[in-house]
């Protein structure tokens, strides 16, 4: 539903963002546009050089926690192209393509590697920003380069994967290039000599699986564990799994011997954030209409027409409680957008 904002000079009809992000919070923006070609992207950037705007994919990793005072621009470029050499398939996908549909497309055309990343919501353009990952695989291993438009110069650039500063749910697009680049496409390399990755969780029980077997199991597990955002508003995992030193883990194990962990290297481990949150009794708790999901503590949901303020309140309560109990700082994975842009907990 639109909202009317009135000032001394004019009446402005604000655009509702509720259906444009999967959390479904009641927020609005000053204007909304859908960018469907590189040409229209250049035009939009030229017209908004001195105006605030926020770039959006499918809104699956974004929560609008207040009315945004600017234009929201949906990056909706489409197209998939495939080339190959002796060792790899070279896949060029436009930023507005659905990530899951790209996974399905590649599987259908016997180009394997993406199957562990099935059913991750969002667009191709969002994948490198977040360095999406699941079940032992992160998308960075397949990215050759990312094509983007510099929002200051309006010029197209291509940045190699090695320069993207990929990390755990992290990249240069969240830091040095945050709000400075519009991703328009991504080039992937899928090896022809495919090797399954089945070291994580339920996949470890698969015996000599095909790529289709892995895809099927990932879809099955994700559908069982995670609420469907089209039914129950959410943005998937709200917090990142924290990474701590082995020395810190040893100290924590003195007090919490059952704390699970996953070794990353000889010096660091990853702790499941869901376990930390569950230990503190947040699973199933409400803050107004926002709820910590009763089956998966890492997912916050819009259970009963919640608001952005309620989401921030519950997220901060969880973050502060984890810090107090475990001396671990939880970072939120979801992009929180307020009136003037990014909001931090």
From Swiss-Prot:
It catalyses: UDP-N-acetyl-alpha-D-muramate + NADP(+) = UDP-N-acetyl-3-O-(1-carboxyvinyl)-alpha-D-glucosamine + NADPH + H(+). InterPro entries: FAD-bd_PCMH, FAD-bd_PCMH-like_sf, FAD-bd_PCMH_sub1, FAD-bd_PCMH_sub2, MurB, MurB_C, MurB_C_sf, Oxid_FAD_bind_N. Keywords: Cell cycle, Cell division, Cell shape, Cell wall biogenesis/degradation, Cytoplasm, FAD, Flavoprotein, NADP, Oxidoreductase, Peptidoglycan synthesis. GO terms for biological process: cell division; cell wall organization; peptidoglycan biosynthetic process; regulation of cell shape. The active site is at residues 169, 237, 333. Pfam families: FAD_binding_4, MurB_C. Its main location: cytoplasm. Pathway: Cell wall biogenesis; peptidoglycan biosynthesis. It comes from the Bacteria. PANTHER family: UDP-N-ACETYLENOLPYRUVOYLGLUCOSAMINE REDUCTASE. Cell wall formation. This is UDP-N-acetylenolpyruvoylglucosamine reductase. It comes from Pseudoalteromonas atlantica (strain T6c / ATCC BAA-1087).
